[in-house]
Amino acid sequence: MSYETIPTSDENFDRDVSATNRNVFGWYLYAFSSEPFIVSAMSTYFPLLLEEFARNNGVQVDDHTVACGAEDKHCVLPLFGRRVFVDTSSFALYTFALGVLLQTVLVISVSGVVDVCKTVRFKRNVLLSFGMVGGLATCSTVLLRGNQYYILALLTVISNCCYGVINVVGNSLLPDVVSDLKRVLYLYRVIDSDQLTTVISGRGSGIGYIAAFVVQLCSVWLLRQPEYRDDIRVAVLLVGGWWMLFQLPLIWMLDDVVVRENSTQFKWSRSRQYLKAGWQSLGHAAMHANLLKDVLIFLVGWFIISDSITTINSAAILFSKTELHMSTVNLVVISILTMINAVIGAYFVPQLLSERLELPPHQSLIYLICWAGVIPFYGTLGFVFQSIGLKHPFEMYILAVWYGISMGGLAAVSRSVFSLLIPRGKESTFFSLFSITDKGSSVVGPLLIGLITDKTHNIRYSFYFLFLFVVASIPVFNALNVQRGKVEAEELAGINESRLETNDGFA
């Protein structure tokens, strides 16, 4: 018998209600504390800071004995005892590629531990531990001297890896929070789990974006102060401090309301088994995906377009700084514009495409990909024309709006399309594969853009690659048949259910 079916006294029930409410607010606070890191620091601040450190320690492209000056348009950074020279923009891109690679490995490994030790208390401790390390790594950038670019890259990788872990663990808390909330609300009304999950998840995302928006506004104010003029490290310090400060109440807010079935106590002696479980889970997910043709088509297409969309942001920020010479404050404003329009795109674009234009799901995805492809295509026009094609700073503000709408719309539509293709009862397995595809793809783009920039010393050439990548995803998604995928998913779900019934019959 499940513990959840045991009747409780009024006193115990009131205690459960109070604990459940704390868990809900704790989950919102997790998003509130951590979202500014990925939206502000990783998307804008760290690329600028890495390029700045690289330029300050760089040398001229043609003469490696002469230090890089303020008037030099392109410079290279000596690495590994001056054995290797990389473009100052490439340094940031290579750091991101390495960070995402290590983050993916760490996330897969940690997910095995979380799947075995399912208690809210354990997940809370993981959130606090990695959040504290990530926050400290972020804040530590303010202590660096101008020549410590290796340490800056290391701190960037550490903080990004920590965010990846708390993002996965935080998302795994959502089903627990919903389950507990449904348990205490069932006395008052019938609750639909999917609807409750959607509501809480949506509110959490909204709260996270509000936090990121507040941090961005505070950063603009700080960077405009005479004593902090364009010192991006102050903005990074704000993000790290925010992350650590607002996660502290989780110590008192997140805890178990009921005993979780099949949960085990964490033991250091079983660490190898925990790590192995994460990779086995990934293998099982890949095996399931291999049985569904349209899931494979979607994941291949998503690998391509997700990589392109993510890399467009990094390339555009670095391009704006190195080619258009935009100030840090202006680049933060561009980031704010992107974020606001991403929210608008996520809310209104799916409704416009499906209800007003009556487009089928996969065609909506293709329309959004074409919309996003305008950005790198417009960047390539700069090779042909003198007055358009990202030749002026004001063009970046227009493209920030365009990019935000495409990013928000793609995120919303892609998840809804993918949800139609997966079998019942396997949602967690397939969405973990979706998440890993999303994260893993972000290694390729920055790495290739870094190589292109090293070869040409002109980051504008990266727009050719990004445009080709966006275009390459269109025939892949055009081969997607959502109706066929739904039938395959239903058939696989039916097979799994019949196996369970057969096993029950022999029990």
Curated annotation (Swiss-Prot):
- Recite the UniProt keywords alphabetically: Amino-acid transport, Autophagy, Glycoprotein, Membrane, Transmembrane, Transmembrane helix, Transport, Vacuole
The record's subcellular locations are: Vacuole membrane
Q: How does it sit in the membrane?
A: Multi-pass membrane protein
**Can you name a GO cellular component term?**
fungal-type vacuole membrane
A biological-process GO annotation:
amino acid transmembrane export from vacuole
Q: Mind telling me which residue stretches traverse the membrane in this protein?
A: 24-44, 90-110, 126-146, 150-170, 203-223, 234-254, 295-315, 329-349, 365-385, 393-413, 433-453, 462-482
Primary location group? membrane
Glycan-modified residues: N262, N496
SUPFAM superfamilies noted in UniProt: MFS general substrate transporter
Q: Which InterPro entries match?
A: Atg22, Atg22-like, ATG22/LtaA_families, MFS_trans_sf
Provide the function of this protein.
Answer: Vacuolar effluxer which mediate the efflux of amino acids resulting from autophagic degradation. The release of autophagic amino acids allows the maintenance of protein synthesis and viability during nitrogen starvation.
Cite the PANTHER family for this sequence.
AUTOPHAGY-RELATED PROTEIN 22
Similarity-based family = Belongs to the ATG22 family.
- Write the protein's name: Autophagy-related protein 22
